[in-house]
């Protein structure tokens, strides 16, 4: 598991706030005196799984270390409409300047966590785990994968460096006469401690893969019947992952085939933001 470290949080908050604020928040400078004090809260306007609160808090700290922050919930918690996530007090100008950036993080990451929880709940009672993918917003992978965990999902490989995933293009570009055994052997030699996964899209490919003692087999765009047959053929000799067009409507049926994992790109690549708002209390 790749933890969401304080360094990652600080970097993300500073980069995002700098992008939004630029040299100065000119509207707030023109309208709000620096000595004005205020209290505010960030609250959910719809039911959701909260994620991104530590990043939102860091945005406020980055803008003004003198702001007082009081968390009213923790990431991973289920919020109902009207529930408070965070209370902020101090300089009114600082609160206004940091507001949008802080909300952006909470809205986007809570969207990921909430979407993930829907998929996790859909396969409840089976042994199947919901995986994320590398289909993340550039620059936000650590945050999005953290949000997947907040929603009860499991992280797949974090990047191209921590797990092998051999696909047909890799084999085709190895050179004339290269075999799957050659590819697996090269992977084992390069990084023996890393897990090796091989993608298949036909049942007749499985027998050869099993002779190579790989860790995981990705079943790409197979029908439910093909997945059931694949799980039977593999018989626990490797972990199984179903991938391709995974929707909430069919994910339960896919889990029922007996696969160990279902990877869902939609957890991160096209998530709807959750509606949060900041309300000034004073």
For every predicted segment, state its role.
Residues 221, 244, 266-267:
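Short secondary-structure boundary segments
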Residues 1-201, 205-212, 216, 225-233, ...:
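Acidic/glycine-rich phosphate/pyrophosphate-binding loops and surrounding catalytic core
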Residues 248:
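Cys/His-rich Zn2+-binding cysteine-cluster or related metal-binding knuckle/ribbon modules and their
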């Amino acid at each position: 598991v790749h933890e969401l470290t304080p360094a990652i949080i600080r970097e993300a908050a500073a980069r995002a706030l700098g992008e939004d604020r630029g040299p100065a928040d000119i509207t707030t400078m023109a309208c709000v005196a620096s000595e004005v004090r205020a209290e505010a809260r960030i609250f959910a306007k719809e039911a959701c799984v909260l994620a991104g609160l530590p990043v939102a808090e860091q945005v406020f700290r980055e803008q003004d270390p003198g702001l007082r922050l009081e968390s009213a919930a923790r990431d991973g918690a289920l919020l109902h409409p009207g529930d408070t996530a965070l209370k902020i007090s101090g300089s009114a100008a600082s609160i206004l300047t940091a507001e949008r950036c802080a909300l952006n993080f909470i809205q986007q990451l809570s969207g990921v966590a909430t979407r993930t929880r829907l998929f996790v709940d859909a396969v409840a009672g089976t042994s199947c785990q919901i995986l994320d993918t590398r289909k993340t917003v550039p620059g936000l992978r650590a945050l999005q994968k953290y949000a997947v965990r907040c929603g009860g999902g499991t992280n797949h490989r974090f990047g191209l460096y921590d797990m092998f995933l051999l696909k047909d293009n890799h084999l085709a570009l190895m050179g004339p006469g290269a075999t799957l055994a050659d590819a697996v052997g090269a992977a084992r030699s390069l990084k023996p401690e890393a897990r090796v996964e091989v993608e298949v899209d036909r049942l007749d490919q499985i027998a050869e893969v099993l002779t190579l003692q790989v860790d995981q087999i990705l079943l790409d765009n197979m029908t439910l019947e093909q997945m059931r047959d694949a799980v039977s053929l593999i018989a626990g000799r490797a972990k199984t992952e179903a991938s391709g067009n995974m929707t909430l409507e069919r994910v339960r049926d896919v889990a029922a085939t007996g696969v160990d994992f279902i990877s869902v790109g939609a957890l991160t690549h096209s998530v709807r933001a959750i509606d949060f708002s900041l309300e000034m209390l004073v």
